[in-house]
Amino acid sequence: MRIEKCYFCSGPIYPGHGMMFVRNDCKVFRFCKSKCHKNFKKKRNPRKVRWTKAFRKAAGKELTVDNSFEFEKRRNEPVKYQRELWNKTIDAMKRVEEIKQRRQAKFIMNRLKKNKELQKVQDIREVKQNIHLIRAPLAGKGKQLEEKMVQQLQEDVDMEDAS
């Protein structure tokens, strides 16, 4: 069973699904859904349509260069069936998929980490600019007034003791 890739959005096309367009020069285009086919007929560039994988990779939102993608290459050489080889291949596919998922998650977290740092710097700058909203201009005056009141009370007590 071969799972093809959509020409427009790079999504998976399972056997019996999607549609195929064959141009006069025998170039084959496979589409997963009518939305992709319509956009192809309108001559839209997949790298400029925001929901396609081509856009996400071109914009740096997804992992583009990695050794795990080498395993997905199309191979047209038939291999003689051997049960042991088949089992090893399936185990290797699971392992490669697991590694790929981990690397993609790490890539996304690193990409989001930059934004968190920028947001933190921007928040600090905003607080420094608007510090007067947080700290009232008379905030330190309360203690000074309290100290003056205490001094006046002590002076009054001293005056009464002296008389």
Swiss-Prot record:
<comment type="similarity">
    <text>Belongs to the eukaryotic ribosomal protein eL24 family.</text>
</comment>
<dbReference type="InterPro" id="IPR056366">
    <property type="entry name" value="Ribosomal_eL24"/>
</dbReference>
<dbReference type="GO" id="GO:0003735">
    <property type="term" value="F:structural constituent of ribosome"/>
</dbReference>
<dbReference type="InterPro" id="IPR055345">
    <property type="entry name" value="Ribosomal_eL24-rel_arc"/>
</dbReference>
<keyword id="KW-0690">Ribosome biogenesis</keyword>
<keyword id="KW-0539">Nucleus</keyword>
<dbReference type="InterPro" id="IPR011017">
    <property type="entry name" value="TRASH_dom"/>
</dbReference>
<dbReference type="InterPro" id="IPR023442">
    <property type="entry name" value="Ribosomal_eL24_CS"/>
</dbReference>
<comment type="subunit">
    <text>Associated with nucleolar and cytoplasmic pre-60S particles. At the end of biogenesis it dissociates from cytoplasmic pre-60S particles and is likely to be exchanged for its ribosomal homolog, RPL24.</text>
</comment>
<protein>
    <recommendedName>
        <fullName>Probable ribosome biogenesis protein RLP24</fullName>
    </recommendedName>
</protein>
<dbReference type="GO" id="GO:0042273">
    <property type="term" value="P:ribosomal large subunit biogenesis"/>
</dbReference>
<dbReference type="InterPro" id="IPR038630">
    <property type="entry name" value="L24e/L24_sf"/>
</dbReference>
<dbReference type="GO" id="GO:0005730">
    <property type="term" value="C:nucleolus"/>
</dbReference>
<comment type="function">
    <text>Involved in the biogenesis of the 60S ribosomal subunit. Ensures the docking of GTPBP4/NOG1 to pre-60S particles.</text>
</comment>
<dbReference type="Pfam" id="PF01246">
    <property type="entry name" value="Ribosomal_L24e"/>
</dbReference>
<dbReference type="InterPro" id="IPR000988">
    <property type="entry name" value="Ribosomal_eL24-rel_N"/>
</dbReference>
